[in-house]
Swiss-Prot record:
Residue ranges of every copy of the NTF2 domain listed in the record: 393-543
Taxon lineage: Eukaryota, Metazoa, Chordata, Craniata, Vertebrata
Protein keywords: Acetylation, Cytoplasm, Leucine-rich repeat, Methylation, mRNA transport, Nitration, Nucleus, Phosphoprotein, Repeat, RNA-binding, Transport
Description of its domains: The minimal CTE binding domain consists of an RNP-type RNA binding domain (RBD) and leucine-rich repeats.
Name this polypeptide is given: Nuclear RNA export factor 1
Annotated CDD domains: NTF2, UBA_TAP-C
Modification 3'-nitrotyrosine occurs at: Y126
GO cellular component: cytoplasm; nuclear speck; nucleus
Main subcellular location of this protein, as a coarse class: nucleus
Highest taxon of source: Eukaryota
Entry-annotated residues carrying Omega-N-methylarginine: R42
Motif (Nuclear localization signal): 67-100
Region annotated Interaction with ALYREF/THOC4 and LUZP4, chain positions: 2-198
Organism for this UniProt entry: Pongo abelii
PANTHER family recorded: NUCLEAR RNA EXPORT FACTOR, NUCLEAR RNA EXPORT FACTOR 1
Length: 626
């Protein structure tokens, strides 16, 4: 940047001074500058970014220096394409399209130090369905060299970013198909020579950022904590300095938000009207950088869908301006528009529940429960059995089943399953890397049909016949169940087919997750067995991590040691009292003795304690197993 042959460093008489800030977000927004000649400069020169990337042709990278080869893309509608036949049907395979006018030698660019660099676009087909942090960490774990993704973004269904040298691109090429997603599909990584990303081409120089700060200081009203950036590109001071600040460019928006974050994070009102914004992806960081923002003016821009507001929905806005955007044209008239957005279930109120004014119109007060006190859920009810006979049958079955299940050798469960039994396991959907989850031991067998769409895999994960079921159960981690935590519900019953579920907690007793507490729900469908017991025909097991409350309650009351008769050291009077208490309370001898001992063998006080605890539902079902 030059002005009559002078470099920027020669203009020492013009400075921008900031107040010293020990912590971000404190102090006024003040810039002090002296008088002097305005320096001139040119910002944003070079290739101007288009709104949508123009694509033409499908290419694949063989070596970093090779030219692009045309590859057949089964999803394209363009005729007269030649290429390879479709292969690897079980893999995600979508090719990447190159820019319509690639630079010579593909991807050459110039760094700030003047050296030439090769740029490459990295594309992950269907990458939008993956979390950014998980995706990049998985790629980095498989890549032989460390890399820095530049301008990571989602475009349609794809995830894309840039790297700046051929060796990194080659290393990323080697990661292709080496990562498995949560549905056991291999992730494709396509490498493409590319022009330098727009953030590099259009990045503001340090001296231009200083000028931007100066202009923004003039537009800031400290008394209202309001910043007016209306039509910023046409600001006379910026125009006179030949600085092109286009807020729909990622680099310019990032620079602007950085200035706000460093100087006025306490900002309450921001006017971004008439800046030709057509998407808000680059504004998403405003939620963290300006958390107190109450008023936002986006009028006179080019937003086409209210879905763009999802990018900033974390803001606690009270006033929003959207008129003059294409999204408003979908409503026939202003009254229809206002009626459509004031409803609690409307698109805008869903994103900004505290909104009071829209385009200057007062909205009805939001219907919301803005109460800091936590909502108390009703207490969970105890077990439900229907009849005493069924209760005795089910509790006896569960006692036998889990005694074998926790014994270390589950082969004894063969007698508990029907020859044609089936069994499945599910764990909740894990947004982060499943392999690093504490439930990793269960992940490979999880048949969560909400996330698992492949019918072949669904069928394979369903265990059929009692031999396969018990073999599968033997592979699961060894456990110890807290029988005192069990809550049993009989949801359906016929004379020959009871269906019941049991909820509770258990801990793993060996392996990497030893002593880890899990919560489970298990649903059994059974038929009568020849030994007057039950025989399982369907077994569904759901496992998750235990909540903090479940962890606190788990194994708090140790189960009594099973015994068929009272401890022989009891006196004849105590044994007589024990038999009477067991008969009247319905509890077995072990729990009856525990209740009497806890109350110093005072029969009346023991009866009162029993009645009180039973009314509160604090006596476990195991106490009534005889």
């Amino acid at each position: 940047m030059a002005d009559e042959g002078k470099s920027y460093s020669e203009h020492d008489d013009e400075r921008v001074n900031f107040p010293q800030r020990k912590k971000k977000g404190r102090g006024p927004f003040r810039w002090k500058y002296g008088e002097g000649n305005r320096r001139s400069g040119r910002g944003g020169s070079g290739i101007r970014s288009s709104r949508l990337e123009e694509d033409d042709g499908d290419v694949a990278m063989s070596d970093a220096q090779d030219g692009p080869r045309v590859r057949y893309n089964p999803y394209t509608t363009r005729p007269n394409r030649r290429g390879d036949a479709w292969h690897d049907r079980d893999r995600i395979h979508v090719t990447v399209r190159r820019d319509r006018a690639p630079p010579e030698r593909g991807g050459a660019g110039t760094s700030q130090d003047g050296t030439s660099k090769n740029w490459f676009k990295i594309t992950i087909p269907y990458g939008r369905k993956y979390d950014k942090a998980w995706l990049l960490s998985m790629i980095q774990s498989k890549c032989s060299v460390p890399f820095t993704p530049i301008e990571f973004h989602y475009e349609n269904t794809r995830a894309q970013f840039f790297v700046e040298d051929a060796s990194t691109a080659s290393a990323l090429k080697a990661v292709n198909y080496k990562i498995l997603d949560r549905e056991n599909r291999r992730i494709s990584i396509i490498i493409n020579p590319s022009a330098p990303p727009h953030t590099i081409l259009n990045e503001l120089k340090p001296e231009q950022v200083e000028q931007l700060k100066l202009i923004m200081s003039k537009r800031y009203d400290g008394s209202q904590q309001a910043l007016d950036l209306k039509g910023l590109r046409s600001d006379p001071d910026l125009v006179s300095q030949n600085i092109d600040v286009v807020l729909n460019r990622r680099s310019c928006m990032a620079a602007t938000l950085r200035v706000i974050e460093e100087n006025i994070p306490e900002l309450l009102s921001l006017n971004l009207s008439h800046n030709r914004l057509y998407r808000l992806d680059d504004m998403s960081s405003i939620v963290q950088k300006v958390p107190n923002l109450k008023i936002l003016n986006l009028s006179g821009n080019e937003l086409k869908s209210e879905r763009e507001l999802d990018k900033i929905k974390g803001l606690k806005l009270e006033e929003l301006w959207l008129d003059g955007n294409s999204l408003c044209d979908t409503f026939r008239d202003q009254s229809t528009y206002i009626r459509s957005v004031v409803a609690c279930v409307s698109a805008i109120r869903e994103r900004f529940p505290k909104l009071l004014r829209l385009d200057g119109h007062e909205l009805p007060p939001p219907i919301a429960f803005d109460v800091e006190a936590p909502t108390t859920l009703p207490p969970c009810k105890g077990s439900y059995f229907g009849t005493e006979n069924l209760k005795s049958l089910v509790l006896h079955f569960l006692q036998q089943y889990y005694a074998i299940y926790d014994s270390g050798d589950r082969q004894g469960l063969l007698d508990a399953y029907h020859d044609g039994a089936c069994c499945s396991l599910s764990i909740p959907f894990i947004p982060q890397n499943p392999a690093r989850s504490s439930l990793a031991e269960y992940f490979k067998d999880s048949r969560n049909v909400k996330k698992l769409k492949d019918p072949t895999l669904r069928f394979r994960l369903l265990k059929h016949t009692r031999l396969n079921v018990v073999a599968f159960l033997n592979e699961l981690p060894k456990t110890q169940h807290d029988v005192n935590s069990f809550v049993v519900d009989i949801s359906a019953q016929t004379s020959t087919l009871p269906c019941f579920s049991v909820n509770g907690v258990f801990k793993e007793v060996d392996g990497k997750s030893r002593d880890s507490l899990r919560a489970f729900t298990r649903t059994f469908i059974a038929v009568p067995a020849s030994n007057s017991g039950l025989c399982i025909v369907n077994d569904e097991l759901f496992v998750r991590n235990a909540s903090s409350e479940e962890i606190q309650r788990a194994f708090a009351m140790p189960a009594p040691t099973p015994s068929s008769s009272p401890v022989p050291t009891l006196s004849p009077e105590q044994q007589e009292m024990l038999q009477a208490f067991s008969t009247q309370s319905g509890m077995n001898l072990e729990w009856s003795q525990k209740c009497l001992q806890d109350n110093n063998w005072d029969y009346t006080r023991s009866a009162q304690a029993f009645t009180h605890l039973k009314a509160k539902g604090e006596i476990p079902e195991v106490a009534f197993m005889k």
